A protein has these predicted regions:
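P-loop/Walker-type NTP enzyme "switch/lid" segment
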Residues: 9-14, 29, 33-96, 104, ...
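Gly/Ala-rich phosphate-binding loop of Rossmann-like dinucleotide-binding domains
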Residues: 24, 28, 112
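Anionic-ligand binding region
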Residues: 127-151
Length: 224
């Protein structure tokens, strides 16, 4: 059975693309059939996946998989949603995991009814992070009718020297969502930041603690 997961960003620079690529590539490495569906142009994502661009900004790849999708060099397939407002029914057969990656939350309204889970990324470098995540959840609630539609919050770019700020943000989010919906935070690390430049993933790094942080996310997703 396919699981459709929409990955949203509470603000710019929250790690939406980084988290999606590393989760999708891990599942693909484990033998799962995975698709990343792009809603709105994401140049960083396309370059990271090793997709060339045509003159009119359409991604290209030497290999096609399912009709309309492209193979990537890190494992998951890629699909440009364009104006589509739903996932083609054949994709439910072709894939086990589909990650929807809208450029902005405002572009996700038509996608929400088709999603099984909502994952929201946020950065602890941002001021009022908790408030922005809660505001996004309340906006999504107004669209879905669900009182707490966000299934998982991933705090990214945590600075281990700023425990007061980290604890305050975690406490506010845990009070609102419940601790079970707050993932273990991902550390701020230049090695992670540089991964797109080398078209690599966290699974190719030697730092076990970084791989473990993402693997804990994978374990949550596989339980959904």
């Amino acid at each position: 059975m396919v699981r459709i997961i929409i990955v949203l960003s509470a603000h710019a620079g929250a790690g939406q693309t980084t988290i999606t690529v590393n989760l999708a590539s891990a599942l693909a490495r484990q033998g799962h059939r995975v698709l990343i569906a792009e809603k709105g142009e994401n140049a960083k994502l396309r370059a990271w996946l090793g997709l060339a661009q045509t003159a009119d900004n359409h991604p290209t790849s030497p290999d096609h998989t399912s009709p309309g999708t492209l193979a990537t060099r890190i494992g998951p397939d890629f699909w440009v949603m364009g104006d589509a407002e739903r996932i083609p029914p054949e994709f439910a057969v072709d894939y086990e995991y589909i990650f929807l990656l809208p450029a902005i939350p405002a572009g996700c309204e038509s996608l929400l009814p088709r999603c099984d889970r909502i994952l929201v990324c946020c950065s602890l470098e941002e001021k009022d992070t908790a408030r922005q995540v809660i505001d996004l959840d309340q906006h999504l609630s107004s669209l879905t009718g669900s009182p707490r539609p966000v299934d998982l919050v991933v705090m990214n770019k945590i600075n281990t020297k700023e425990w007061h700020n980290n604890l305050e943000c975690f406490s506010l989010l845990a009070e609102y969502f419940g601790e079970e919906r707050i993932a273990d935070p991902l550390p701020h690390c230049e090695r992670i930041h540089d991964l797109p430049l080398d078209s690599r993933t966290v699974w190719e790094l030697s730092q076990e603690n970084l791989r473990d942080a993402f693997m804990r996310l994978i374990e949550i997703i596989k339980l959904w």
